[in-house]
Amino acid sequence: MAKIVVTGGQALHGEVHISGAKNAVLPILCATLLADAPVEISNVPHLHDVITTVKLLSELGAEVTIDEGTLAKGRSILVDPRSVTHQIAPYELVKTMRASILVLGPLLARYGTAEVSLPGGCAIGSRPVDQHIKGLQALGADISVENGYIKATSNGRLKGGRYVFDMVSVTGTENVLMAAVLAEGTTVLENAAMEPEVTDLADCLIALGAQIEGAGTPRITVQGVERLGGGHHAVLPDRIETGTFLVAAAMTGGSVTVRRARPDTLDAVLDKLTEAGATITTTAESVTLDMHGKRPRAVNLTTAPYPAFPTDMQAQFMALNCVAEGVGVINETIFENRFMHVNELLRLGADIQVEGHTAIVRGAERLSGAPVMATDLRASASLILAGLVADGDTTIDRIYHLDRGYENIEEKLGALGATIRRIA
């Protein structure tokens, strides 16, 4: 099984280009099932989860063509959904990726039936699918869970309705939003997720002919249409990848510019980096961070739904606090079991105490390289970041988690001066 070896001690300097957002491209690929003509998606990142989604679309009968593109143009995927013949998403594909549940709404709305295996993905606590089910039931769907599958049917077109999410759910909002696009009448979604990836999905749907207002706010209104046509959409840049590279620069005392970024989606993260002592300069599509060779200051943070601090950046900032001046307190309010990276950071010499959903991190002047194991996607990123500042070699096992969410991370870090390599 592949591993990554990081040799610490190098400050990062230079420029890096940000890839398309993992959490935007997956629902957008699923949304192509709603159309009755080919849809082209560009700025698609090279990620394992994208490959899994393409396999799933192909399994359903869609014709999928991948254009690898160039460094400047990027990768694009053309999906022709007119050949879809199956409405069952099998366990073999769904078990590796939670986002597979996002075919439920589109299949149900377009074909009146869908069977989707209960999802897998990162093992970071119970991420219930009840918000998806309740939301679709509010549109008139008949849903049962049998033998590990969610089975949904509708009698004719779904009917517009009002649904108030019990809790903010990004994928729940996306699934119900996609279904509502082809429902008869008006749908109002309250307490909807406001994440930029939800807005990007809505922008894609609008480009295909949907009528949506309020995406990016807690109240989304959808006027159902009879059909969606073909079209093109470019996926927005990945704010979590952007944040990860900025934290890497901050931890190593370096100076890095990230390009093809969207700093307007990163306010909470940029505020914390400024608090840590970084000088931040932004343009519409770039962020420059300069630590002037200094050690970062510890920061306190609490994860919460957008526009607050993202849970997907929590592990990276914990790594930063491990080598910062002072004590940082991190409160995780989104997912349970999302401190699984703590034990691995302790192996590198970190000083962390966990009390329930709170981690107290006392900064150490140095970390020491050691063999560690990735437990989920963002935890694997935090271990690489810690390895960048640890003495000696840090060997990270189970990096298949990393390939689910970061495109060529070792090449990108290497271009900034990191000593990092992948081994078999």
UniProtKB/Swiss-Prot annotation:
Coiled coil: none annotated. The keyword Cell division applies. The active site is at C122 (proton donor). GO terms for cellular component: cytoplasm. Pathway: Cell wall biogenesis; peptidoglycan biosynthesis. Keywords: Cell cycle, Cell division, Cell shape, Cell wall biogenesis/degradation, Cytoplasm, Peptidoglycan synthesis, Pyruvate, Transferase. It holds the Pfam family EPSP_synthase. It catalyses: phosphoenolpyruvate + UDP-N-acetyl-alpha-D-glucosamine = UDP-N-acetyl-3-O-(1-carboxyvinyl)-alpha-D-glucosamine + phosphate. This is UDP-N-acetylglucosamine 1-carboxyvinyltransferase. It comes from Xanthomonas campestris pv. campestris (strain B100). The lineage of its organism: Bacteria, Pseudomonadati, Pseudomonadota, Gammaproteobacteria, Lysobacterales.
